């Protein structure tokens, strides 16, 4: 390799492209740090309040739902980002198709979860907890907007939404502890965080002068996405 080729292959740290990706990565790291910090502080507070038994029940319900939640996401995350990067003009078609696929997947996940709880003869209280928590899969459908900002290397919008919803839900958890709330309310707040996420993504999408009403479902696109993503679903469950 010539000296000129070597120079050309070096990273241009002063380029706009590098600055854009560096800033994007910094936003992602910042969100992870904030999430870990808040989860640690509030988590200890909540665990001490609930105690081993109640916290165990809540964790079990969340994990139980998690087994079926992968069906709702359909393993489409990286696939959709790839397609949006490849052809940004298909934005409404891709986001619309994935949105409706995730709605269908969420309904299937909810049905399978509830049926399984009865087959396993779970207690009434466990079924109630699981039934509340599994509704979060429906609200995760609008999170497809996250893929759009990932593809545009604008993760700051995702960080705004995710951090805001986390902070609000954490404050509510602290208030629940303060007012001696029952375990059911903590399950409701778990779902509320996803509701806040959906609302937040809707807002940032609208702020960027984009409309969800423009989304459209295209069967050929949906089939193509599922064909590419299905190998990722099983590993996600396991």
Name each region found by the language model:
Residues 11-20, 50-54, 68-103, 150-157:
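Transmembrane-helix boundary and interhelical linker motifs in polytopic inner-membrane proteins
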Residues 43-44, 77-82, 143-146, 150, ...:
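Interfacial helix-capping/hinge residues at the ends of transmembrane alpha-helices
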Residues 15, 47-61, 86-97, 108-138, ...:
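Membrane-interface helix-capping segments at transmembrane helix termini in multi-pass transporters
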Residues 130-134, 160-207, 224-228:
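Hydrophobic alpha-helical transmembrane segments
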Residues 2-17, 21, 156, 183-187, ...:
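Interhelical loop/hinge segments that connect adjacent transmembrane helices in multipass membrane
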Residues 19, 23, 27, 96, ...:
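Alpha-helical transmembrane segments of integral membrane proteins
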Residues 67, 71, 103, 107, ...:
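Alpha-helical transmembrane segments of multi-pass membrane proteins
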Residues 3, 17-77, 110, 114, ...:
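Signature of the first transmembrane helix
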